[in-house]
Curated annotation (Swiss-Prot):
<dbReference type="GO" id="GO:0008833">
    <property type="term" value="F:deoxyribonuclease IV (phage-T4-induced) activity"/>
</dbReference>
<dbReference type="GO" id="GO:0003906">
    <property type="term" value="F:DNA-(apurinic or apyrimidinic site) endonuclease activity"/>
</dbReference>
<keyword id="KW-0378">Hydrolase</keyword>
<feature type="binding site">
    <location>
        <position position="179"/>
    </location>
    <ligand>
        <name>Zn(2+) 2</name>
    </ligand>
</feature>
<keyword id="KW-0540">Nuclease</keyword>
<feature type="binding site">
    <location>
        <position position="229"/>
    </location>
    <ligand>
        <name>Zn(2+) 3</name>
    </ligand>
</feature>
<feature type="binding site">
    <location>
        <position position="145"/>
    </location>
    <ligand>
        <name>Zn(2+) 2</name>
    </ligand>
</feature>
<feature type="binding site">
    <location>
        <position position="109"/>
    </location>
    <ligand>
        <name>Zn(2+) 1</name>
    </ligand>
</feature>
<comment type="similarity">
    <text>Belongs to the AP endonuclease 2 family.</text>
</comment>
<feature type="binding site">
    <location>
        <position position="182"/>
    </location>
    <ligand>
        <name>Zn(2+) 3</name>
    </ligand>
</feature>
<protein>
    <recommendedName>
        <fullName>Probable endonuclease 4</fullName>
        <ecNumber>3.1.21.2</ecNumber>
    </recommendedName>
</protein>
<dbReference type="Pfam" id="PF01261">
    <property type="entry name" value="AP_endonuc_2"/>
</dbReference>
<dbReference type="InterPro" id="IPR036237">
    <property type="entry name" value="Xyl_isomerase-like_sf"/>
</dbReference>
<dbReference type="InterPro" id="IPR018246">
    <property type="entry name" value="AP_endonuc_F2_Zn_BS"/>
</dbReference>
<keyword id="KW-0862">Zinc</keyword>
<dbReference type="GO" id="GO:0003677">
    <property type="term" value="F:DNA binding"/>
</dbReference>
<keyword id="KW-0227">DNA damage</keyword>
Length: 281
């Protein structure tokens, strides 16, 4: 079964995200459990946690259908100790929020070396950050998102993801989220069925499909191998609709959140309906 949705707003409380997902007929959703552009946030109230769980129960969203995203400020591979510790503390808080809400996945961008340490050292730091956080939490899987490779961001090569996973001690609690826009911008083509076969075979060979825990379904304004992260609505960018049909018809993508982060929320209901329709083509 395919779980399809979008990254919805949690304005007014995390429980409201569930209602917004239901309104667009989503069978999965992503959200921020706190303000993504601030370091500090008030703890989740018991009332907010209870409302979130109740709404998920009412509208039929289980843990496999929910993909929270952490703060954009966090850099788990930061080259400077003080900033690294700040990021690690914030990441732990994000993981603990997921624990409180009964969510089993936390999606995050791996980190950036900022031209101050080498790639391998940065990847090692990211793995260490994950290990520290997993030791202090239970039941939540750290889901590494591949990146477009803008600036000094790592995670744009499948080898980066594999290296991080290799350094994580508890392999049962680490996984990957593949963003189609990022994948394309990083140089992995997806425009034809043959491209999809090749790219996902490479992913399986280097990382392994057993680690695929989620996907972000986005077309791209950016060009192939541009290392520029610019999302577009499905079928309106440089990728086209082929890979989205491919994903919807391939059982390897069953049972995980497939999340839109496309640029026009007004057409999310149509995009979700179209994706669902592709399963039976």
């Amino acid at each position: 079964m395919k779980f399809v949705g979008a990254h919805v707003s949690a304005a007014g409380g995390v429980d409201q995200a569930v209602l917004r997902a239901h309104e667009i007929k989503a069978t999965a959703f992503a959200l921020f459990t706190k303000n993504q552009r601030q370091w500090k946030a008030a703890p989740l109230s018991t009332e907010s946690i209870d409302k979130f769980k109740k709404n998920c129960e009412i509208y039929g969203y289980g843990p496999a259908q929910i993909l929270p995203h952490d703060s954009y400020l966090i850099n788990l591979g930061h080259p400077e100790e003080e900033a690294l510790e700040k990021s690690r503390a914030a990441f732990l808080d994000e993981m603990q929020r997921c624990e409180q809400l009964g969510i089993e996945l936390l999606n995050f961008h791996p980190g950036s070396h900022l031209k101050k340490i080498d790639v391998d050292k940065c990847l090692q730091r990211i793995a260490e950050s994950i290990n520290i956080t997993l030791d202090k939490t239970q039941n939540v899987t750290a889901v590494i998102e591949n990146t477009a490779g803008q600036g000094t961001n790592l995670g744009y090569r499948f080898e980066h993801l594999a290296a991080i996973i290799d350094g994580v001690e508890d392999k049962s609690r680490v996984g990957v989220c593949i963003d189609t826009c990022h994948t394309f911008a990083a140089g992995y083509d997806l425009r034809t069925v043959e491209d999809c076969e090749k790219t996902f075979a490479e992913f399986d060979n280097i990382v392994g499909f057993q680690y695929l825990k989620a996907m972000h379904l986005n077309d791209a304004k950016s060009e192939l191998a541009s290392r520029v992260d610019r999302h577009h609505s499905l079928g309106q960018g440089n990728i086209g609709k082929v890979p989205f049909t491919y994903i919807m018809q391939d059982i390897r993508f069953d049972g995980i959140p497939l999340i839109l982060e496309t640029i026009n929320p007004d057409i999310w209901p149509e995009e979700i309906a179209w994706l669902k329709s592709q399963q039976t083509q």
